[in-house]
Amino acid sequence: MSKVNVNKVVVAYSGGLDTSVIIPWLKENYDCEVVAFVADVGQGAEELEGIEAKAKASGASECYIADLKEEMVADYIFPTLKTGAYYEGKYLLGTSMARPIIAKAQVEVARKVGADALCHGCTGKGNDQVRFEGAFAALAPDLHVIAPWREWDLVSREECLDYLAERNIPCSASLTKIYSRDANAWHISTEGGVLEDTWNAPNEDCWAWTVDPEQAPNEAETVTLKVAKGEIVEVDGEAMTPYNALVYLNEKGAKHGVGRIDIVENRLVGMKSRGCYETPGGTIMMEALRAVEQLVLDKASFEFREELGLKASHLVYDGRWFTPLCKSILAASEELAQDVNGEVVVKLYKGQATVTQKRSDNSLYSEEFATFGEDEVYDQSHAEGFIRLYSLSSRIRALNSQKK
């Protein structure tokens, strides 16, 4: 494929080996100015330390750092939580939810500096290339997109390190990298290494955040969450922003080994991959929201929310955040969440987050009607007519069979 003419490109920069190579490679192969863009999505202070200097040492003319933590949790994670989305029944979409806001902010920087191209460091095997480029297509269809991993002939970490050494570009990366990790305020994912063989149990170093449940405290701890319109607004009696609530619950959950999963998932590009994911605070939040939903959503609404969650999980995973369908699902979930108000107590113990108490002013649960003892509010004889109508089609089908 022939290269397009590019004057200025904004690259999503992490400070790692791949993107450190990408900056000089872009300058050499596209003869263009390179602007680095760094998204702070809660990956940690260590990852961001000195990152502007690293980018410029690699050849970037400028480096923009955007603090996206609050916006990511409030405008991307919380709306997704309201849908009840779990990808393939387990994954709380930690990497997937971070990509659209990173891409959006990258486009904003490109507009600000007058760039005519965008660049990402995703490989040609993974989901992220689709997520980034899908977002770019929706937000900036006029900008060129460069994906070096689909163009260059570098195939190993050793070759990447040699590339930088030949150009006297400093890099702290080592030749040996056991795992591939992605981190943000919501989760940490770990892939590769021993995990590539599904018969290998995860080593303890596969987990970067949470305490081994077997080594977690022997005494349970409880947290109390207040929910308003499907969002966590207060934890343990203190009003908190979405991000601060997540940080607080992450600390509590990680201490007790909450939020670990080991999953083999179907990637968008067709292959399967295995990963160990840690989502301590998110797991607690999801348990609390589901508990309130059990109280306030009627049967039809709950079933519909389940359907929304399934569809939303695939849309978010597949990089279709900026689509009319995703927007519609989020809007429907927002409407269903209007009555999702209440208070929940969650017990944290040895890797488990268990709801032990829940209440809501909007609750459809009535102790008077639900009692298994004697009551005066429900005439059980009324059930007979309902059952005859409810089973009418089965009765007619059986009668037809008897006539044959």
From Swiss-Prot:
Cellular compartments annotated: Cytoplasm
Top-tier EC class: ligase
Pfam families registered for this protein in UniProt: Arginosuc_syn_C, Arginosuc_synth
Pathway assigned in UniProt: Amino-acid biosynthesis; L-arginine biosynthesis; L-arginine from L-ornithine and carbamoyl phosphate: step 2/3
Biological process per Gene Ontology, one example term: urea cycle
Tagged with keyword Ligase: yes
Claim: Coiled coil is one of the keywords in the record: no
Coiled-coil features, chain-numbered ranges: none
One Gene Ontology CC term in the entry: cytoplasm
Family according to the record: Belongs to the argininosuccinate synthase family. Type 1 subfamily.
Official protein name in the record: Argininosuccinate synthase
Designated gene of the protein: argG
